[in-house]
Amino acid sequence: MKRSMYAGRVREEHIGQEITLKGWVGRRRDLGGLIFIDLRDREGIMQLVINPEKVSAEVMATAESLRSEFVIEVTGQVAAREQANDKLPTGAVELNVTALIVLNTAKTTPFEIKDGIEANDDTRLRYRYLDLRRPEMLENLKLRAKVTHSIRNYLDELEFIDVETPFLSKSTPEGARDYLVPSRVNKGHFYALPQSPQITKQLLMNAGFDRYYQIVKCFRDEDLRGDRQPEFTQVDLETSFLTEQEIQDITEGLIARVMKETKGIEVTLPFPRMKYDDAMALYGSDKPDTRFDMLLQDLTEVVKGVDFKVFSEALAVKAIVVKGAADNYSRKDIDKMTEVAKQYGAKGLAWVKVVDGELNGPVAKFLTGIQEELTTALALEDKDLVLFVADTLEVANATLGALRGRIAKELGLIDNDKFNFLWVVDWPMFEWSEEEGRYMSAHHPFTLPQEETAHELEGDLAKVRAIAYDIVLNGYELGGGSLRINQKDLQERMFKALGFSAEEANDQFGFLLEAMDYGFPPHGGLAIGLDRFVMLLAGEENIREVIAFPKNNKATDPMTQAPSTVALKQLEELSLQVEEDETNKTN
């Protein structure tokens, strides 16, 4: 029989109507001779009542056989509940069943189909199709669909053209590791799955599309964490003839639309702007969380004269003040924070507490001569905890930035109902890679340098600034973009600055350089991480919670067992041979 409506949409206006519902058995209760069933579908739960005096013996027997997650079809009359359940949208009504059919049975599930389960992540991913039945997971994916719908409508209104770009593309050496796909037809040659459609979308600007967008899958073979996956989705934009400000205005409008249509929140425009150097100096991060204070303080000059070489001889001494938290952190707690500091390259973590107007702690004796100056500089009050890092400026910033975020979570300083957006602008063009022993692109090698610093491409690369901009939300990089290079000579200079020979640049990017001979317009764009955006809107801490079928932290899928070995014949067709891992060899 045809389904009348979703179970979760039955309301008081349907009282007296005969309807047919289909879904899963959430729970069965036997009470006073009656059987009560919670019928669940994607829209919610509806209570069913099977009364032995009003149904056949066959229907009653079927009802008694029901177990959790059986799939059933029921027909009956909607009635008002004697005692309403205010916790359910359907709580004022119930269905008096007259007919019942079992469409499929189910084994006992490895975890309950409800919110707040304690199953481990791999178990949830192994049975992802069951995990997705849980209401909170279903709501997360429905939110994701609403977000993409809102984005498409907004960009369509602004006359952006949705264009699909290739998944089988060329491997390039910059950025994260590529996922490689061997070519059967062209032996020894490989495609790469795109880390982003960066070059192809730029070529679309050269083709005259003017405004492009795509909600697109991208792939990066990198170490995983809570806000990363090997395959992820981004909202990709590119425009011609627009300024940095105009691109940011479009992006702010997009985010404002999404926030209003999915969360009912009116965001204030324009978003604040913060220079990269200020973000690092004050927050210790290029993606600052501005929902709480605890800014980094530079004490390098203040402590120059103290009789403590760790401070007086350090390139930089910086501190954060944790207001009123002296009693919240024991020496053991601070030892744990010291271990965190070492993970960011710091040699240690110095600290003092303000107790009855005096400084207490391991380094307090070295600071007595500057206590008044220190108290004024840091606006110290009783019960404050001060954490110091003495090292290079980069290490001090990164360490205190990490501790700042950790402490704010521990002390509940963050208002989780806030959505603080901001732009981080005026980025360095290059960043030094210790692993590579050279400067690498901070964003990518197609970013347009600021005109007044472009001459340093042949000089001090640390001084080159980019016309680049990242959009940040609550301490997460939501997206980033830039104006792009459209002049061939400047692009060649950029490649040379990155250490490419002319031959290497032509081998890797010759098609782009050639395109620049044919009237390439000024252009720029941006990409927003859709998974991360939805994660933050949903109040989750891991993007796995807003992706239907994600990978685990080992980049594997416990359900399908991907990645897996393949048949020898498949490898032979690709002219590939797999070397056995030394750790798996037996003597």
Curated annotation (Swiss-Prot):
Q: What keywords are annotated for this sequence in UniProt?
A: Aminoacyl-tRNA synthetase, ATP-binding, Cytoplasm, Ligase, Nucleotide-binding, Protein biosynthesis
Enzyme Commission code: 6.1.1.12
Q: Does the keyword Nucleotide-binding apply?
A: yes
Indicate whether Transmembrane appears among the record's keywords.
no
Q: Which residues cross the membrane?
A: none
- Binding locations of L-aspartate: 174, 220, 443, 484
Return the GO cellular component terms, semicolon-separated: cytoplasm
Which domain of life does the UniProt lineage start with? Bacteria
- Which SUPFAM superfamilies does the record cross-reference, listed alphabetically? Class II aaRS and biotin synthetases, GAD domain-like, Nucleic acid-binding proteins
Q: Which positions in this protein are listed as binding ATP?
A: 220-222, 229, 477, 529-532
Q: Show the segment(s) annotated as Aspartate.
A: 198-201
The cross-references to InterPro entries, in alphabetical order and at most eight, read: Aa-tRNA-synt_II (IPR004364), aa-tRNA-synth_II (IPR006195), aa-tRNA-synth_II/BPL/LPL (IPR045864), Asp-tRNA-ligase_1 (IPR004524), Asp-tRNA-ligase_1_N (IPR047089), Asp/Asn-tRNA-synth_IIb (IPR002312), AspRS_core (IPR047090), GAD-like_sf (IPR004115)
Cellular localization per UniProt? Cytoplasm
Query: Enzyme class, one word?
Result: ligase
Q: Which GO terms describe its biological process?
A: aspartyl-tRNA aminoacylation
Q: Which GO terms describe its molecular function?
A: aspartate-tRNA ligase activity; ATP binding; catalytic activity, acting on a protein; nucleic acid binding; transferase activity
The reaction(s) this protein catalyses: tRNA(Asp) + L-aspartate + ATP = L-aspartyl-tRNA(Asp) + AMP + diphosphate
Q: Which family does it belong to?
A: Belongs to the class-II aminoacyl-tRNA synthetase family. Type 1 subfamily.
Query: What is the role of the protein in this entry?
Result: Catalyzes the attachment of L-aspartate to tRNA(Asp) in a two-step reaction: L-aspartate is first activated by ATP to form Asp-AMP and then transferred to the acceptor end of tRNA(Asp).
| UniProt protein name | Aspartate--tRNA ligase
Q: Which gene encodes it?
A: aspS
